[in-house]
Amino acid sequence: MTKPGNKAERHIPVLLQPVLAGLMPLIGAKVIDGTFGAGGYTRALLNAGAQVIALDRDPHAVREGQSLVDEFFPRLRLMQMEFSQLDRVVEEKVDAVILDIGVSSMQFDEAERGFSFQKDGPLDMRMAQTGFTAGDVVNRLKKDDLARIFKILGEERYAGRIARMIEKRRCVQPFLRTGDLAHAIEALVGRKPGDRIHPATRVFQALRIYVNDEIGELARGLFAAESVLKPGGRLGVVSFHSLEDRMVKRFFSARSGGCRRSRYLPEIEAVPATFFSLFKGAITASKEELQQNPRSRSARLRIGIRTEAECLAKDIKLFDFAEIASFEGSKK
């Protein structure tokens, strides 16, 4: 059992009640939680009577979650794995899949993981703790590619200015700490009194998404979920910024036959829908939840219900996403 004061216990999963209601019925259901994190959704699903296969690419999250495995054995399996590979962990179709996209609050709270500029730590940001770091990206990528990352993945209006500043500064002293990069961006862009959002927020978001290939991971995860859900099964996705939410919206729209094509393109044969939406649009946090959990402010939940149709092609182009240079191909 989780001990009082444990980080996992302090974690509050966002939109929990809408998620549970949207994935019902759960008694005896086989559910994949593709983003275990601190275990908030998994515990709630287990308490509702489900059998859960939980995945997380972060080895720390998997270690911390072993007490939950012991508590709910044999109804819980917890594995270190990217959720894009969830189709490899089941032999039979499942009743539901839930994905909570992005960094967990547990990762944000640990300064040494380097996800947050609010707590100074190394420029790391790796969820799986393997591969190149955010520091590698900042100190080694070409200026133009940095600007593109900040612009596309962070929707940062000052992307070019910030990239030029980074290129100039790193020649003298490389960026090694989150606080150093955040202060440099704030000094360049400025911050008006009363501004709620720190000027480095979007750059840090972009770096985290790039380091962990979160866009590619989400696309592959949506395709994988489509392949493992039984007819009537439900896919719930919680996202925290517009980039992710647009991808999820576009996926459900395309899979339900709702994607609009250009009038200049030739007509194509209609394909059977593999999903239909449980509700129109996205669910957001209630006033009560916003008061209890400010992190839920930007959360959006979309749920699709699987039809009997065969899976469609796994075409990454349906997301209409701009290409970004690979780390190896962009190093200066």
Curated annotation (Swiss-Prot):
The residues that hold S-adenosyl-L-methionine are G39, G40, Y41, D56, F83, D100, Q107
For this chain, one GO molecular function annotation is: rRNA (cytosine-N4-)-methyltransferase activity
UniProt-listed Pfam families: Methyltransf_5
> Catalytic activity annotated for this protein?
cytidine(1402) in 16S rRNA + S-adenosyl-L-methionine = N(4)-methylcytidine(1402) in 16S rRNA + S-adenosyl-L-homocysteine + H(+)
Location, primary (coarse class): cytoplasm
What Enzyme Commission number does this protein have? 2.1.1.199
Q: Which cysteines are joined by disulfide bonds?
A: none
Question: What is a single cellular component term in the Gene Ontology annotation?
Answer: cytoplasm
A Gene Ontology biological process term: rRNA base methylation
Q: Keywords for this entry?
A: Cytoplasm, Methyltransferase, rRNA processing, S-adenosyl-L-methionine, Transferase
Compartments where located: Cytoplasm
Tell me which InterPro entries the record gives: RsmH, SAM-dep_MeTrfase_MraW_recog, SAM-dependent_MTases_sf
Q: Which NCBIfam families match?
A: 16S rRNA (cytosine(1402)-N(4))-methyltransferase RsmH (TIGR00006)
Q: Which family does it belong to?
A: Belongs to the methyltransferase superfamily. RsmH family.
Function noted in UniProt: Specifically methylates the N4 position of cytidine in position 1402 (C1402) of 16S rRNA.
In Swiss-Prot or TrEMBL terms, this protein is called Ribosomal RNA small subunit methyltransferase H
Q: Taxonomic lineage of this organism?
A: Bacteria, Pseudomonadati, Pseudomonadota, Alphaproteobacteria, Hyphomicrobiales
